[in-house]
Amino acid sequence: MTTTVPFVTCDLLDDHTDKDIQVLTPSLDGRFFKSYGARKIFSGQIVTVKCFEDNSRVKELLATDGTGKVLVVDGGASMRCALMGDMIAESAVKYHWDGVVIYGCIRDVDALAELDLGIHALAAIPQKSNRQGIGEVGVNLYFGGVTFQAGCYIYADNNGIIVSKQKLID
């Protein structure tokens, strides 16, 4: 089990006004990130993957050591299929990932709610994705008004998601 130091994103913003911290904003079309995992507060160093309706790279990455890391997935906000379900999420727990943020959908909602993993996604859908081995790892991502770069730090709770180039907590 990975341990995250308790924090509140609001307080991190208030306490670090001298740092360049980005705040993920809800989109004008009403898309909001929702928490699906049992872990409601999570943080870590960002690992990025860009994929559209193909979770091959997500599955591969979450089967590697994720200690102190959060996978950020740009799924193009697709509402047609899920990029993570219970089996991939169980792998993430097994390999000590702190969390996963998906700009797209997940599935197996009830099973995910039981896992000690931070999970934020736009929505749930029962349809699984195609696996064709397509996706880019380690690329800069941009959604919700935030640029996600591999190696930066992400902090998520029920208030929202923030990103910083510097580590804000130990």
Swiss-Prot record:
Top-rank EC class of the record's enzyme: lyase
Family recorded in the similarity comment: Belongs to the class II aldolase/RraA-like family.
Superkingdom assignment: Bacteria
Needed cofactors: a divalent metal cation
Entry keyword annotation includes Metal-binding: yes
Annotated GO biological process: regulation of RNA metabolic process
Reactions the enzyme catalyzes: 4-hydroxy-4-methyl-2-oxoglutarate = 2 pyruvate; oxaloacetate + H(+) = pyruvate + CO2
Organism this protein belongs to: Acinetobacter baylyi (strain ATCC 33305 / BD413 / ADP1)
A GO MF term: metal ion binding
The enzyme's E.C. designation: 4.1.3.17, 4.1.1.112
InterPro entries named in the record: RraA, RraA/RraA-like, RraA/RraA-like_sf
Keyword line: Lyase, Metal-binding
The keyword Cell membrane appears for this protein: no
Disulfide cross-links: none
Entry protein name: Putative 4-hydroxy-4-methyl-2-oxoglutarate aldolase
Bound cofactor: record note: Divalent metal cation.
Record NCBIfam families: NOT-MenG, PRK09372.1, PRK12487.1
Binding site for substrate: 85-88, 107
Quaternary state and interactors: Homotrimer.
Binding site for a divalent metal cation: 108
Function: Catalyzes the aldol cleavage of 4-hydroxy-4-methyl-2-oxoglutarate (HMG) into 2 molecules of pyruvate. Also contains a secondary oxaloacetate (OAA) decarboxylase activity due to the common pyruvate enolate transition state formed following C-C bond cleavage in the retro-aldol and decarboxylation reactions.
